[in-house]
């Protein structure tokens, strides 16, 4: 900052001092002419005021007369209030303008602080073009590298999907085979059981009902022979067939009469009977005996028909069960095939997904390889461009060295 002192000649002060900035190590000085011009005082006005810094040779006698005159003038000026006010106003104005100029210079210097020396203009335009191309290729190289990495991840995911699909395919095929075998075995077992039961029923009918029918049929034939023998005529032959006895017995809860011991014996022999004495066959049977035999014959024939119907119905039911069991066993293969086909269908779907995943894997792998190849080509091109830039810089440096040598020469 500038300090104004009253009683000091402004012209002498401005001519003998310069405005400096004490805070800067290498400050820029401001001349008095610049300060006076900034406040509107030109050189001509300074000359008119008698404040010009230009010195001239003093007139003779000045060295002895002037000091007293100047001293008197200064003493009078100090006492003059108007003069002091004018000088103070002039000093304040000069100080303000000087501070403004100094601050402007300081701001300009501070704005230039931190700037580096720009050598961009010294390089060749071809180098700048190659540098831009190098930056572009580097960007492309990075993009290719990222794309290759992502495609590798896609390929890996597709491989994992394929592996999972293969596992699911195997599980579906296995479950289908197990379901088919289990269902077929179960249905075959049911059919075999029904067929076996039908065979057992038919066997039981033949064992029980057929035996009863045979026994009743034999009894019926015996009774018919006795009844039919009443109309026969004896021709005098010896040892004529005869029915010696007729036994009566109970069967079950119903009281029935049974004809036993119908034998062919000679006339000389006799037999003992339990209930009725029967004469020789060549003799007539009493009507009472004929009625009993006829009634028994009807009962036996009724039992034969009943047993025959029972056996036929049992055999029909048994055959029906056998046919049902055989049909179930034959259809077990078809039903089991349907169950197995469902598993094969699921396995086929998984196989189609495997094919899609494999295609995705191949496409991603191929694209990843192409991206890596493009990245390698970009790297090679960048290296070639760097070599070209180095060659250009070396040529430029050689040319500048030659020019500098010529200038020194």
UniProtKB/Swiss-Prot annotation:
Tree of life domain: Bacteria
Biological process, per Gene Ontology: actin filament organization; positive regulation of protein localization; protein localization to Golgi apparatus; regulation of entry of bacterium into host cell; regulation of protein localization
InterPro entries registered for this protein in UniProt: BipC/SctB (IPR005427)
Localization annotation: Secreted; Host membrane
Keywords from the named record: Host membrane, Membrane, Secreted, Transmembrane, Transmembrane helix, Virulence
GO CC field: extracellular region; host cell membrane; membrane; phagocytic vesicle
Topology of the protein relative to the lipid bilayer: Single-pass membrane protein
Main localization (coarse): secreted
Sample GO molecular function, one term: identical protein binding
Family, similarity comment: Belongs to the SctB/SipC family.
Quaternary structure annotation from Swiss-Prot or TrEMBL: The core secretion machinery of the T3SS is composed of approximately 20 different proteins, including cytoplasmic components, a base, an export apparatus and a needle. This subunit is involved in the formation of a pore, called the translocon, in host membrane. Interacts with human PERP.
NCBIfam families per record: IpaC_SipC, PRK15373.1, T3SS_SctB_pilot
Function: Component of the type III secretion system 1 (SPI-1 T3SS), also called injectisome, which is used to inject bacterial effector proteins into eukaryotic host cells. SipB/SctE1 and SipC/SctB1 are inserted into the host membrane where they form a pore and allow the translocation of effector proteins into the cytosol of target cells. Plays a role in promoting human PERP translocation to the host apical epithelial cell surface via promotion of exocytic translocation.
Name of this chain's protein: SPI-1 type 3 secretion system translocon protein SctB
Organism from which the protein derives: Salmonella typhimurium (strain SL1344)
Lineage of origin: Bacteria, Pseudomonadati, Pseudomonadota, Gammaproteobacteria, Enterobacterales
């Amino acid at each position: 900052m500038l300090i104004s002192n009253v009683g000091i000649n402004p012209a002498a002060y401005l001519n003998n001092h310069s405005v400096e900035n004490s805070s800067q190590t290498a400050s820029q000085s401001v001349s008095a002419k610049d300060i006076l011009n900034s406040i509107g005082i030109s050189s001509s006005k300074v000359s008119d005021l008698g404040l010009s810094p230009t010195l001239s040779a003093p007139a003779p006698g000045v060295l002895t007369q002037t000091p007293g005159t100047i001293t008197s003038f200064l003493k009078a000026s100090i006492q003059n209030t108007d003069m002091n006010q004018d000088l103070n106003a002039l000093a304040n104005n000069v100080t303000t303008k000087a501070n403004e100029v100094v601050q402007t210079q300081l701001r300009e210097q501070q704005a230039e602080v931190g700037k580096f020396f720009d050598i961009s203009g010294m390089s060749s335009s071809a180098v700048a073009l190659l540098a831009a191309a190098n930056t572009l290729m580097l960007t492309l190289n990075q993009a290719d590298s990222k794309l290759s990495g992502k495609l590798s991840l896609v390929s890996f995911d597709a491989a994992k999907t394929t592996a999972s699909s293969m596992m699911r395919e195997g599980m579906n095929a296995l479950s289908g085979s197990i379901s088919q075998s289990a269902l077929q075995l179960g249905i075959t077992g049911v059919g075999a059981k029904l067929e076996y039961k039908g065979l057992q029923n038919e066997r039981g009918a033949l064992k029980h009902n057929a035996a009863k029918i045979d026994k009743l049929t034999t009894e019926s034939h015996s009774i018919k022979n006795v009844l039919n023998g009443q109309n026969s005529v004896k021709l005098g032959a010896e040892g004529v067939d005869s029915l010696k006895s007729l036994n009566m017995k109970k069967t079950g809860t119903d009281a029935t009469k049974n004809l036993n011991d119908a034998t062919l014996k000679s006339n000389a022999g006799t037999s003992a009977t339990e209930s009725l004495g029967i004469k020789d066959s060549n003799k007539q049977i009493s009507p009472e005996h004929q009625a009993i035999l006829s009634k028994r014959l009807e009962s036996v024939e009724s039992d034969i028909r009943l047993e025959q119907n029972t056996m036929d119905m049992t055999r029909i039911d048994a055959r029906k069960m056998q046919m049902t069991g055989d049909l179930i066993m034959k259809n077990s293969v078809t039903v089991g095939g349907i169950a197995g086909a469902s598993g094969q269908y699921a396995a086929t779907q998984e196989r189609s997904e495997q094919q899609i995943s494999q295609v995705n894997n191949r496409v991603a792998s191929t694209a990843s390889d192409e991206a890596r190849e493009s990245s390698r080509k970009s790297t090679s091109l960048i290296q070639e461009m760097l070599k070209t830039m180095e060659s250009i810089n070396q040529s430029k440096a050689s040319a500048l060295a030659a020019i500098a040598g010529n200038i020194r020469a």
